[in-house]
């Protein structure tokens, strides 16, 4: 979407070739702007080095939707790879409408400043929160009340759950927007209207996974959509939606048309809760992480000094419980540690209807 609106942009993603990046970097235009996924950033670095371009001096690095490094690093291990490059840029910024606290020591070491922009107008949005034990029954009631809606946009972060919903509801006028891997999975189940890129016009029922809608701009056509956010803890805990980040980002995907500030008709979150969810305290997480780091560094030291046991020690390191906290350089990844705290924070909201309600109020964004 962003690429189509600006001919001077270059989008670097999974299928983009190094030759294409080099060709763009050689273009004789006053300003160059490259948009990339974190996973594809090494392609830019490689192309720049080949052309003897010092991107760290000549380019400004803007890391958008920066909370995703914390939120997604547990299943997108490569999302934080460019952080070493990021800190080498002379001009740089981490930005988001919904940032999370970050513990990476380099921010303090490089004297980063926290700048908060507060609107001087009323930006709060109305949201209906429905907490239920009769999940599908309530969902059917809500959808029945929206039967005259031209476009219903449903955000549900589990592909199999989306497939089941489409089957159970018997809908035919639908589109699913998700990763290419999920597209292939859905098509094997006979759901042919699945896309890895936004496809217009929107259908009556439009399903989005969280991996897809991040940083996406959804154009509003003639009719405004109704938005449903779904969380079903019986299916998967990763269907939880964080009121402080994801809920705000979801409604913000729909861009204003002209001077119209209202971009959708309604915003609803249907969810189950689980009072039996065990929440680790910050102290418990801190103790576990500190013990892991101690054990990891001990094994790492032995690996460096004992050549004969190197293979066995490496295997022990890879089998450690918190191995996911280690980045591709073998260093402790601060974003992975932040992820542990963040997940417990979000999980705590789903212990009761009141806790979730208070969380939505606490954002200062929703009525």
Regions found by a protein language model. Give the residues of each.
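SF2 helicase catalytic motif II
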Residues: 38-41, 49-93
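Conserved SF2 helicase motif VI
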Residues: 234-263
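The feature captures the C-terminal accessory region of ATP-dependent helicases
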Residues: 282, 287-367
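Conserved helicase ATPase core of P-loop NTP-dependent helicases/translocases
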Residues: 181-209
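Interdomain hinge/linker at the junction between the two RecA-like core domains of SF2 helicases
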Residues: 97-145
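A short beta-strand element within the Helicase C-terminal
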Residues: 217-232
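Conserved strand-helix element at the start of the C-terminal RecA-like helicase core
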Residues: 1-3, 34-38, 138-170
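Inter-Walker segment of RecA-like/P-loop motor cores
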Residues: 6-49, 188-195
């Amino acid at each position: 979407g962003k690429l189509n609106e600006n001919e001077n942009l270059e989008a670097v993603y999974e299928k983009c070739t190094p030759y294409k990046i080099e060709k763009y970097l050689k273009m004789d235009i006053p300003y160059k702007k490259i948009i990339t996924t974190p996973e594809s950033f090494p392609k830019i670095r490689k192309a720049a080095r080949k052309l003897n371009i010092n991107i760290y001096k000549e380019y400004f690095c803007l890391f958008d939707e920066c909370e995703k490094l914390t939120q997604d690093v547990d299943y997108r291990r490569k999302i934080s790879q460019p952080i070493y490059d990021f800190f080498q840029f002379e001009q740089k910024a981490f930005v988001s409408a919904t940032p999370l606290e970050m513990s990476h020591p380099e921010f303090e070491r490089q004297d980063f400043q926290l700048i908060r922009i507060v609107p001087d107008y009323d930006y709060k949005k109305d949201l209906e929160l429905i907490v239920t034990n009769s999940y599908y029954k309530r969902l059917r009631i809500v959808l029945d009340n929206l039967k005259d809606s031209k476009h219903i946009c449903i955000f549900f972060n589990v592909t199999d759950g989306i497939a089941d919903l489409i089957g159970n509801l018997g809908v035919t006028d639908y589109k699913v927007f998700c990763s290419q891997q999920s597209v292939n999975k859905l098509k094997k189940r006979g759901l042919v209207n699945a896309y890895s890129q936004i496809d217009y016009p929107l259908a009556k029922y439009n399903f989005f996974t969280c991996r897809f809608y991040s940083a996406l701009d959804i154009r509003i056509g003639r009719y405004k959509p109704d938005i449903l956010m779904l969380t079903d803890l019986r299916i998967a805990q990763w269907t939880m939606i964080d009121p402080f980040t994801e809920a705000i980002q979801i409604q913000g995907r729909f861009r204003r048309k002209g001077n119209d500030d209202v971009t959708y008709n309604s915003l609803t979150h249907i969810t189950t809760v689980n009072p039996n969810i065990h929440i680790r305290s910050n102290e418990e997480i801190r103790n576990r992480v500190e013990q892991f780091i101690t054990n990891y560094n001990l094994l790492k030291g032995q690996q460096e000094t004992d050549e004969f046991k190197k293979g066995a020690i490496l295997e022990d390191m890879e089998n450690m419980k918190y191995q996911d906290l280690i980045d591709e350089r073998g260093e402790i990844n601060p974003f992975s540690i932040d992820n542990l705290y963040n997940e417990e924070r979000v999980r705590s909201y789903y212990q009761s209807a009141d806790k979730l309600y208070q969380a939505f109020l606490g954002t200062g964004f929703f009525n």
